[in-house]
Amino acid sequence: MTELQQKATSLDALAEIERQVLWLSTAIVHHANRVRPNPGGLKVGGHQASSASMVSIMTSLWFRHLRADDRVSVKPHASPVLHAINYLLGELDESYLPTLRAFGGLQSYPSRVKDPDPVDYST
């Protein structure tokens, strides 16, 4: 159990973690579409609303309820939330956060094969 998971014993603590997850997942998508150089100008992907709709549920699961043998299938457009949670849990190196949809980077749909962080099911 990580330090963050141990702190998530109250609703206030869980709400603070939820804010961090929302901010990180939004920043991951924003960087992919607005910050990373993109000569063609096309949106490369990421769905902030689809991610935001899952932040509360996924934060509660990962920081309060999941047991070691539990497995979760994450809806495809919520992968930035999964990556943010894995980062906060120490299971994803910070260097990957700005790599959504980049070659060799984080996938926009969770992938057990291509993502560098733990994914239970590819979707």
Residue ranges, per PLM feature:
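Short, contiguous pre-domain boundary segments
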Residues: 1-10
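Cofactor-binding active-site loop characterized by glycine-rich and histidine/acidic residues
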Residues: 9, 13-21, 25-39, 50-123
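Short, surface-exposed loop/turn segments at secondary-structure junctions
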Residues: 40-45
